[in-house]
């Protein structure tokens, strides 16, 4: 109704076409968020929209996230896929040169567009789509730096959501059935997340088995005008 965006079956279900008015709003939001992440010590990077399938084999996405990925395309005998997440590309940037512990923490951020297969029945406006741009970030740090970096990230997210006036709840999502890594590593990571939240007086709920295949996570659930919760940052 506001002529901000549309979808078109010729383009494909779950893919958003941004109209001029919507593009203005999106650009203003991205400018604000870019200023915010730079203020919080992040550096900007860019990674390709598609990558060699081998990258997603190494990262574990093909084994653990394949049902949410689009199919492979073959070019000159090599297989490529649209990226479902930005993390493999950020890790490749980190690994592109020798690093010292003195360089850490390194905080990388990207407005990265990703593509995920969602069943047509669960697509919902702009809230559940097949292609979307994340204000994504990855922090490379030593184990000793983890608590401080989690705290800094909590500050960043709170500042952003408070600026936009979103009430939110926090959920600590734990190890899913299908997961990489030793269970004791998961327990350690989950304990650090819980400890930092408690130290900062942040109320949270436990989402048993709701973590990503590669690690536990904090889910910020945004609450809309009629009380529904939506996946946030």
Residue ranges and their predicted role:
Residues 29, 149-153, 189:
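Hydrophobic alpha-helical membrane-association signature
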Residues 74-77, 141-142, 223-227:
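Short acidic-glycine loop/turn motifs at beta-strand connectors
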Residues 49, 84-86, 113, 136, ...:
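Active-site proximal loops enriched in glycine and acidic residues that flank catalytic Cys/His/Asp
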Residues 117-120, 228-232:
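Active-site-adjacent "gating/activation" loops or surface patches in catalytic cores
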Residues 162-231:
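Metal-assisted phosphate- and nucleotidyl-transfer catalytic regions
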Residues 4-20, 128-184, 208:
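Conserved alpha/beta enzyme-core scaffolds, especially Rossmann-like or related mixed alpha/beta domains
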Residues 35, 159, 195:
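Surface-exposed charge patches
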Residues 1-123, 127, 139, 162:
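Auxiliary tRNA-acceptor-end handling modules of aminoacyl-tRNA synthetases
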